[in-house]
């Protein structure tokens, strides 16, 4: 038995694992070969089995690279062999995740990481993660498209709470956990909070400690479900009905860990939900969740590329309008968690410079609106293969959005905001260094920039591209010499980073 189409790297050690049950002890041979099976890149044997489930592990180090390799599992004895979970991971994996992807997430400077969703939060049961990974039952998502085409719509709950917290700590992000108020009871969701934040004197805090994590995780941010009110999420989608569910869950969660920052769900901006959900929940939840996806340019007709691009850029202003609408209807004490935003083409779409310019405008707009519109959190959805990182079987790279995120973080994170608009942001750090980012979102026009009043420029980097069509990313250029005179002409669809 085996599997085709596996990408392997030469000299990379892999850990193979398999759970089996047999009538008697069996000798297994595991190998990585080419598609025909004639060229064997590596092979290992293991003896095991029996009338109870047993996990067998071997290490495999292929002597050649192949993007269409076969994993082959053979056994010598005739008889009954029942195979459960099978896995093949790089030996240097991080809690089942690829190390290169984790390092790329760290380099992006992500400060808040939301999990398990998104729509997936409506199907996730955190208690499944208390089992060993090989024993977690697969389930078929009713939103199966979100895990297609890799698993035929099934999910295997491979990441549990401990893995997620480890990831957050590794990349330096605050965890933001979304509960499932439809299929988990208030007591079960309160137990999740206790597992994360309780000390060893509590039942679930003791369980966490017994699993190797003595100190509480102290998770501050919790979302009371995802996208209730839209109709695609299971559960009560009326404002009053959701309010009751959220209230029951939130109270139990606060009993387990007082002082949590709870975020309520809903189809915001929505006047009815603001009145009959957000307002009565204000005693336990001081944030509402708001999502926005910009216009998705189809780029199927070359004669309409400029029109499609401009509509996408204009949708940033629409996002601002919707934030203002929510602010108008919400109580002043309730803040906004803009915890999903992106420009959305389709699942598994190739990224483009269009996305990068859109992201730069949104980040500028959020910095401008954060204080006056009461935006507490903002989460781009999602990092892997829908946004910042392009992850392939054997490498990971920044998309145009990822390039913008990485440099915006490098340029502005931790600084004091001096001035912000959709087109330009200026910040100053503790040493008095001034950092500026400027966006030229025009499709054809150049943009003159005069920064002579700031004095000599110490750094000047331009992100530019000849095309906005997918797949595309920015070319990064050092333009310090061109900026020496205090002025610069920005090309169309470009981003300029200046430091003084």
Regions of interest found by a model, annotated:
Residues 119-161, 201-232, 296-301:
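Aromatic- and acidic-residue-enriched carbohydrate-binding clefts of CAZyme catalytic domains
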Residues 1-157, 174, 190, 240, ...:
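Extracellular and organelle-lumenal recognition/adhesion modules and their flexible linkers in secreted
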Residues 69-77, 238-356, 362:
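Noncatalytic carbohydrate-binding groove/subsite architecture in carbohydrate-active enzymes
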Residues 90-110, 157, 164, 185-224, ...:
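An active-site-proximal structural segment forming one wall of the substrate-binding cleft
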Residues 334-427:
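Aromatic/acidic polysaccharide-binding cleft in carbohydrate-active enzymes
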């Amino acid at each position: 038995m085996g599997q085709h189409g596996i990408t392997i790297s030469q000299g990379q050690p892999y850990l193979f694992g398999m759970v089996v049950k047999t009538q008697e002890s069996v000798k297994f041979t595991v190998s990585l070969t080419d598609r025909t099976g004639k060229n064997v890149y590596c092979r290992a044997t293991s003896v095991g089995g029996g009338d109870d489930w047993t996990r067998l592990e071997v290490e495999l180090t292929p002597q050649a690279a192949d993007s269409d390799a076969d994993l082959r599992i053979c056994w010598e004895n005739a008889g009954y062999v029942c195979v459960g979970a099978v896995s093949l991971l790089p030996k240097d994996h991080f809690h089942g995740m690829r190390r290169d992807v984790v390092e790329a997430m760290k380099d992006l400077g992500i400060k808040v990481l939301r999990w398990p969703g998104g729509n997936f939060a409506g199907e996730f049961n955190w208690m499944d993660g208390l089992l060993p990974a090989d024993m977690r039952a697969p389930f078929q998502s009713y939103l199966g498209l979100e895990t297609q085409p890799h698993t035929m719509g099934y999910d295997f709950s491979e990441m549990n709470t401990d893995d997620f917290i480890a990831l957050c700590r590794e990349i330096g992000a605050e965890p933001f956990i979304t509960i499932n108020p439809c299929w988990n009871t208030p007591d079960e969701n309160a137990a999740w909070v206790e597992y994360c934040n309780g000390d060893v004197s509590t039942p679930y805090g003791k369980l966490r400690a017994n699993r190797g994590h003595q100190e509480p995780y102290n998770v501050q941010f919790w979302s009371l479900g995802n996208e209730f009110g839209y109709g695609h999420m299971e559960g009560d989608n009326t404002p009053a009905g959701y309010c009751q569910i959220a209230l029951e869950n939130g109270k139990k969660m606060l009993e387990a860990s007082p002082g949590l920052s709870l975020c309520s769900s809903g189809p915001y901006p929505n006047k009815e939900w603001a009145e009959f959900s957000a307002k009565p929940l204000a005693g336990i939840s001081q944030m509402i969740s708001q999502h926005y996806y910009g216009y998705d340019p189809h780029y199927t007709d070359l004669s309409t590329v400029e029109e499609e691009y401009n509509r996408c850029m204009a949708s940033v202003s629409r996002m601002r309008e919707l934030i203002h609408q929510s602010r108008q209807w919400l109580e002043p004490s309730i803040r906004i968690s803009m915890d999903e935003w992106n420009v959305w083409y389709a699942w598994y779409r190739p990224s483009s410079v269009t996305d990068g310019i859109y992201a730069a405008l949104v980040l500028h707009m959020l910095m401008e609106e954060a204080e006056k519109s009461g935006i507490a959190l903002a989460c781009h959805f999602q990092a892997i293969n829908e946004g910042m990182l392009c992850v392939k079987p054997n490498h990971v790279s920044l998309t145009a959005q990822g390039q913008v995120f990485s440099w915006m973080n490098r340029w502005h994170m931790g600084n004091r905001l001096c001035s912000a608009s959709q087109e330009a942001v200026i910040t100053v750090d503790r040493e008095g260094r001034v950092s500026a980012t400027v966006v030229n979102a025009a499709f054809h026009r150049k943009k003159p920039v005069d920064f002579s009043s700031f004095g000599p420029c110490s750094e000047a980097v331009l992100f530019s591209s000849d095309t906005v069509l997918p797949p595309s990313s920015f070319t990064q250029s050092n333009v310090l010499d061109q900026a020496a005179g205090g002025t610069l002409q920005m090309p169309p669809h470009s981003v300029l980073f200046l430091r003084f």
